[in-house]
């Protein structure tokens, strides 16, 4: 008896110690771990919120839906065995991930066109509609299983909301009132769904965790790694055109030696003449006059210098100027008057990189020909010709442009509004460290009436960085941007302008 009496205090001490150990509730993350339903539903609802909200800055319109896609995948992965409808949600989430992630990777390349992007967006929207329909019916089945009324009003409202948003996008709705009302409704719907999830949790509804070979963390890391590797490969290998570079035939120059000498005597720049094809040289046979203008353009920030100047009132002021020690791009424009009763000029726009700027993807020449600047004075006559060249280890290589001709597009300008343009474009790519990268575009302008200014413009767009998302070409950027520095691209402008009667350039 005494031994048992001595054990009672020990038992009391153990019970007291046990009570002290459970005085506090476990941390929230522990609670979430033991309530898989709550964790899965939170992932689903946050995933839906991120997938349906578009913030068009800092690439959030791509980043947030990508995170939302992963959350939907993980959330429905845990719920897929609850009923056939939630299993359908998981299938839709997998298919959407298979659509969204390749699209994100392809956005680092210039491969997908507008039609491809539109098709991917349509497939993604259709899968989201199917997912929301399954989610609505899946929640109704869950409520019935939990002994609650079979209602899924919040999910049904979300389905109707998404259908209406698709309709507004299809008709290109531009008003402000309806989107604000839709945003308010969206917030209310999400609150309703969170309350529904909490009500099921409080009613004691639970799901049994299923053993999986790949944890959620591992799956998310694999998706992130695949996305990172895919985007890196896209930037490195998918950002430039495939050019047909061939060694230049030096013997071509001897075929037009007499015409070459005639053009040189008239003042045709020899550096430009050396890059012309025999056909473009022969087109100038019997030339009457040559007009040429050359400008060097910087593609660097230069350096700032200060100097003193008079203010005109006896005082002195300090003036800051930017000085460019290096001007990397040389643009030369040449006009050659051809023989004949009708005044006709052959116009050449030539570029030469005097130093290696580093080529990161695509380049583009945009030409505003004389008939576009002065339609009453000039007409376009003949085809557009040209090529690009570069040197490597003492050997010259040539290639045709990726495309050469008129491109019709719609531009939106602050000053002129939305209008349709049709310009000459010559897009191309150069090897990463091409030497003496150069090229030209040529066309013929015939006079409609005499004494009209011949004004021909050349805009050169250079890609100065790999980092842009989504990736666009220099030509696409030129169609939508102004001159100067525009993110990964920089555009400079050059013109050949003169009155044919005196052949004196205006600049």
Where are each of the predicted segments found?
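Membrane-interface extramembranous regions at the lipid-water interface
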Residues: 2-58, 63-108, 129-168, 183-220
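Membrane-helix interface segments in multi-pass membrane proteins
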Residues: 52-65, 102-125, 165-182, 230-250
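Internal/C-terminal transmembrane anchor helices
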Residues: 208-242
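Short extracytoplasmic/periplasmic juxtamembrane "stem" segments immediately C-terminal to an N-terminal membrane anchor
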Residues: 247-268
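Short N-terminal edge-element motif at the start of the domain
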Residues: 268-385
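Flexible coil/linker segments and helix-coil junctions enriched in charged and small residues
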Residues: 306-320, 417, 425-429, 474-478
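Short helix-loop boundary/capping segments
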Residues: 371-449
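Extracytoplasmic/luminal low-complexity segments enriched in Pro/Gly and acidic/polar residues
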Residues: 421-507
